[in-house]
């Protein structure tokens, strides 16, 4: 998570 999404690694 970096953008606010649960799978945005």
UniProtKB/Swiss-Prot annotation:
Expression by tissue, per the entry, reads:
Expressed by the venom gland.
- Compartment list: Secreted
Query: Listed GO molecular functions?
Result: toxin activity
Q: Which GO terms describe its cellular component?
A: extracellular region
What is the annotated signal peptide range for this record?
Answer: none
- Tell me which UniProt keywords the record has, alphabetically: Secreted, Toxin
Domain of life the protein comes from: Eukaryota
Primary localisation category: secreted
Keyword Secreted carried by entry: yes
According to UniProt, the name of this protein is Toxin To40
């Amino acid at each position: 998570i970096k953008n606010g999404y649960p799978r945005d690694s």
